[in-house]
Amino acid sequence: MSVIFNQAITILRARKTGSIYSTEQVDDWDNPIAIPVPFPVSIQPRGSTEGGVERQQVTRRWALYTPPGRDLDLRASDRVRLSTGSVLMVNGAPLHWPHPWKPEAVHHVEADLEVVDG
């Protein structure tokens, strides 16, 4: 195990379920699909922001990196559960960086994560 790639994670993906209000499928986060990731990743802090005085809110941002040569089926609609139990939301589409010498391969994946309190 590398010093920087030391976090075990599980991808949480919402199940699709019927809505009582329409015929469209909706996300069900009460019972998400848990997808274990078979290799450790790096989770690094990116900073935080605080809301105004009228609403106490803190948004903490993190960056996820996979080891070189590892692709990850992570979607913008997913969440990530850390081994500590913390659940972070994926913020935007994950970036699948191409390998510089193997055009058909992914070098690594980067994703922005965040958690909002308040």
Could you describe each region identified by the protein language model?
Residues 1-26:
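Active-site-proximal polar cores
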Residues 24-118:
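Short, conserved turn/kink motifs that form compact alpha/beta structural patches or helix kinks used as
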